[in-house]
Amino acid sequence: MLLTAATTATNSFAGAPGSNANQNTLILYDSTGQWGWLGEDYGIMAANLVSHGSKYTVHAAANYVAGEINGYTGLVYVGSTYDEPLPTALLDDVLATTKPVLWMGDNIWQLSARATNFATQYGFTPMFFDFTNTLTVTYKGVALQRNALAVSSGLLQTVINDSTKAQAIAVATNDVGGTVNWATKGANLTYIGEVPFSYTGPNDRYLAAIDLLGTVSNPTMLARKRALVRIEDVSADDSPTQLRAIADYLYSKNVPFTVAVIPFYVDPNGYYNNGVPVSLHLRQVSGVVNALKYMQSKGGTLIMHGYTHQYSNVANPYSGVSADDFEFYRAHINSSNYVVYDTPVAEDSMSWTQGRIQKGLLEFSNAGFQAPTIFEPPHYAASAIDYQVFNASFTARYDRGLYATGWCPNGVCGTGTPNYTQIYGQFFPYLVRDIYGTVVIPEQLGNVELVEFNNNPPRFPADILLSAQNNTVIKDSVMSFFFHPYLDISYLKQIVQGLQSMGYTFVPANTVKQG
């Protein structure tokens, strides 16, 4: 039987390793109306991020009880439903507390209406929704992006009444030079004029929200400058020469690194071999095995990147070949050239997933390697069942999360039925413990891609370094990217040197995993 923090009947969760044991955050979200399901999603996204700083409890705001805030060191409310009927006890307790409160999006007007004199207490007043084309949010002097698709939701504008009590800590700028307060802080209350969890990207205002969540979850958070690099999609089909060259370079720059290994390479239909099927066990290719051992000697840590990193003998969605396709999730490419996530694979079950994990671990053993302790799901996609298996089989994941609506009714994760027609991904800039109970090593900067694919633009070292610069707004952010070994090593050198010149020190993934 698998028993994890995600499957016990509670809405209270442990923080990530290194979180502040003296901190405990209450996270509340909206749950009524047509978009009530979205409230749960946003609450879970906030909760995942809060785990870096503290343990937490997450549940619907409607279930708040008087005095509940007294058991916590801070409160986060995510307002996604216009005029959600918030309990009077919640409004009164927020107005009475001196603990840090972060309020996002809707219903701040309920709080101001309940106050005796909101402007006197906090130094600002919530006003009206601004629907101008605000596409930039400046926070800590860094200009972050705001997707045009978010504009139609509006930004709740504030007015500063007393600059000795309140200030705009982030300002949005529209396309004609007008400005709107994006985040306002007065006394112990910080207010963000939207829920910045939709239409996010690597340079998005989401980064500012992450940092503001950290000020509530752990006001004494460390400000380390650490970096991670992962060498991606390494299998028996790779070039030992390229792998050794990468190891030599990284070692010369005092850069520990991770190698994401696919232990069993298959091309079931001979897609890259003139129609002749190929299957290569790691142990069968001594050149790659020796190169991996060489990489270990130069500071490399091997992790498991799926078993075959593909599914059956079908295009899922590309070729059916290892490293190309999804393994634990079905996907197709639509007529607009977007990858569409369909459902978990037909065989999806704990026993099926455990079987693949065990086969993968056996491949490592047969090739003379110790069992990896860290797992990376292929294409960062799996079912809730799979994530529970990964949690039981490894000490951490190294990825971005994929979550489904319905898994966490009232914050009690694992008691609901995941709705795979409503899935959402989330990237993290630092170590978290997500709602599956798993310690998640971050990867948020992406990778070098020389050409556009599936409507994703090319991504060069300069793009990755720009995202890293934007991530500096987040206290304790880990600059984490990955690199495919078939690319010219000059791209890797540019990123490593760029991050080091920014003052970041590369560390092993296992160091970040410890907190």
Regions found by a protein language model. Give the residues of each.
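Metal-dependent polysaccharide deacetylase catalytic core of the NodB/CE4 family, i.e.
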Residues: 109, 256, 260-385, 445, ...
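Catalytic grooves of carbohydrate-active enzymes
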Residues: 226-236, 240, 351-354, 358-374, ...
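Aromatic-Pro/Gly-enriched surface loop or interdomain linker
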Residues: 13-71, 223, 250, 259
